[in-house]
Amino acid sequence: MQVSNVNDVKIYNLSCGKSLPEWLSDRKKRALQKKDVDVRRRIELIQDFEMPTVSTNIKVSRDGQYIMAAGTYKPRIRCYDTYQLSLKFERCLDSEVIKFDILSEDYSKIVFLQSDRYVELHSQHGRYYRLRIPKFGRDFAYHYPSCDLYFVGASSEVYRLNLEQGRYLNSLQTEASQINVCDINPTHHLFAAGTTEGRVECWDPRTRSRVGLLDCALSSVTADMEVEGLPSVSALKFNGPLHMAVGTSTGQVLLYDLRSNRPVIVKDHQYGLPIKSIQFHSALDLVISADSRIIKMWNKDNGKIFTSIEPEADVNDVCLYPNSGMLFTANEAPKMNVYYIPALGPAPRWCSFLDNLTEELEENPENTVYDDYKFVTRKELDELGLSHLIGSPMLRAYMHGFFMDIRLYHKVKAMVNPFAYEEYKKEKIRQKIEETRAQRVQIKKLPKVNKELALKLYEDEEEEKQLSKKKKKQKKMPNILTDDRFKVMFENPDFQVDQESEEYRLLNPLVSKISEKRKKKLKILEKLEAEGEEEEEEPEGKPSDAESSETSDDEKGWVEEVRKQRKLLRQEEKERRQERVREDQQTALKPQFYEIKAGEEFRSFQDAAKKQKLMRKTLEDRIKVEEKLGTLNVADTAVGSKQLTFTLKKSEQHRKRQEAEKQHQEERKKLRRSAGHLKSKQAKGRPFY
């Protein structure tokens, strides 16, 4: 149980204790309660008073016996019996609950407005009926005399559903584009609806006509408020026959008297968050208003703050238990908070023991400040020989150890270890020696990957250190060796810098020239500082012309170096190409053989379409085709059987080609005229050899 004191008002948070995991068995839970003091001393007012993830709404039945809460995930409703201080039942729903209301004295009649436009009516056994409204709903109110449900939402109409007749009635047409909240006065049953334009429209359910219009947007603007947009109405609540509170989306609460169109009090939460809930405490004339961050309680007559509660999680809904000082909140957290404020009223009848508990805490306040105490563990108690004091007033159990008086601790420590001061002195001397050793020159161990780069960075770091000693105002540059973001660069071999790559060789001349230029500049600065010369316009001690000429010479130098590297790269590429050509020439090409898979049939290289067409024919037709082609010969044997001879197509074509050539040669011989009978004349003159 956590106790806070805000504005001299004590607030007891009954839900701040440790919670046990649901997956633990009962035996382990009991064992944990025996071991852990905080778990054993916690106050679990209602068993399992929580939701799996988030709780959105919470209400108390009119008879005060049942507490109902809606939450997610999965969307569900839980009912707690205060007489049994435990969960009575739980029902899972199809979609998230926007708002629900208890129509009966107990939990037997409940209405749920869901996020998918469905409205569910539940009875004791479960869901009784389910229907849908035309537009997405945001709030609803129940008119008891006529049994009408008024639904408001993303529409200008107020939908009326009569539960006695079981049908929709004529809607109320408003001037607003959308309506956020609504409420019905319990005394004279005036219906009020808060719009997104910052207005409140009041209707008479008897005549179904509008009887009033309040412009709350202009009234909520104060002198010290920055207006960023038109504030809309986010909360609405009646108090008695004449008073009404309106909450805006900018964090103001306006208290109205129905006889006037101007607010009596404008209370600003100073957070700029929409007001989510407004409650009235009639006994002390207090208004309890809540946004997602804070719950404020203030006087409705003068606006003076009474107290405030700031939960750890965002608040979704607030419910005040009737005629008591107990407060329930639905939060953006699994636990639903339970607050008990004795100044608001007594504890409810079902937890009257809280009054006695708070009285005991006030009579015997525990000192929570332990400046005069020393925290010791069980092991230290054994070393000091004080284990027999466990359970006595000299030791106060706290967490995993005990608190004991600091004077007693020093006395026992001196008796047990009289040479403690000498040990302390030796330890201090050892620390001083270690500090002096750390100031000596240390050999830095180079990493396994990128050793050259690491060595270069070490050298640059040393130069910057030397310069920073002389110029204290110079900002120290970050080093990637000590940066965790670049740690992998010196550990993973995949990040090794390839100094033979083309990119590195082309970039290296430029980098080396820049580093040389930087070193030269550092030397010049050191020289100027040593001589004591301070020149603001020419910090390097050179005229502008000389500096520009030096810069141009440097640029020419590294340009020549880059050209040289490019020429070397082209020459190396040419040599590699020639080497590949020589290897290709020496390599003897061999035919490639392809193996047919097991179970596959070899098919010739003819057109597959022709073969398929041939296979569709009958055996007789195929034999005739083969006979025409000359590849198939059928002959009868002497014993009455048949003999089939197949000739390969290639050999048959070769034979035909040879026969055609032979026939052509014979025809040429017949047509040729012989010249053997002709004799040539003897040549005159000297023969030519």
UniProtKB/Swiss-Prot annotation:
Source organism (scientific name): Xenopus laevis
One annotated Gene Ontology cellular component of this protein: 90S preribosome
Record lineage: Eukaryota, Metazoa, Chordata, Craniata, Vertebrata
Positions annotated as WD repeat: 50-90, 174-213, 228-266, 270-308, 310-349
An annotated GO BP: maturation of SSU-rRNA from tricistronic rRNA transcript (SSU-rRNA, 5.8S rRNA, LSU-rRNA)
Protein's recorded name: Nucleolar protein 10
Basic and acidic residues compositional bias, start-end: 554-585, 658-669
One Pfam family per UniProt: Beta-prop_NOL10_N
Bias kind Basic residues: ranges: 670-689
InterPro entries listed in its UniProt record: Beta-prop_NOL10_N (IPR056551), NOL10/Enp2 (IPR040382), NOL10_2nd (IPR056550), NUC153 (IPR012580), WD40/YVTN_repeat-like_dom_sf (IPR015943), WD40_repeat_dom_sf (IPR036322), WD40_rpt (IPR001680)
Residue ranges the record marks as coiled coil: 422-476, 511-590, 647-679
Residue span of region Disordered: 529-592, 646-689
Domain of life: Eukaryota
